[in-house]
């Protein structure tokens, strides 16, 4: 049976931390940034951690071997 492939879209959007959590960049920085405050834009630059069942499903089905 062949090895499972990691989805290319997931490789571009998520990364695994050393403890096994999913790191993802925040959405909402493509356009319409004039209406946001400087504080909102500054906070959107940081990464966030995806937790819960969504993260488990992504790791299990879309990243079977993690991201190398």
Swiss-Prot record:
InterPro entries assigned: Ribosomal_bL35, Ribosomal_bL35-like, Ribosomal_bL35_CS, Ribosomal_bL35_sf
UniProt-listed Pfam families: Ribosomal_L35p (PF01632)
Entry superkingdom: Bacteria
Keywords on record: Ribonucleoprotein, Ribosomal protein
PROSITE patterns from the UniProt entry: RIBOSOMAL_L35
GO biological process annotation, one example: translation
GO cellular component terms, semicolon-separated: cytosolic large ribosomal subunit
An example Gene Ontology molecular-function term: structural constituent of ribosome
Family: Belongs to the bacterial ribosomal protein bL35 family.
Protein name as catalogued: Large ribosomal subunit protein bL35
Organism: Orientia tsutsugamushi (strain Boryong) (Rickettsia tsutsugamushi)
Gene expressing this chain: rpmI
């Amino acid at each position: 049976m062949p090895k499972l492939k990691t989805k290319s879209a997931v490789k571009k959007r998520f990364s695994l931390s050393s403890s096994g959590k999913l790191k993802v960049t925040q959405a909402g920085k493509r356009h319409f940034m004039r209406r946001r405050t400087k504080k909102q834009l500054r906070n959107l630059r940081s990464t966030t951690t995806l937790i819960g069942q969504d993260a488990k499903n992504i790791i299990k089905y879309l990243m079977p071997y993690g991201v190398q």
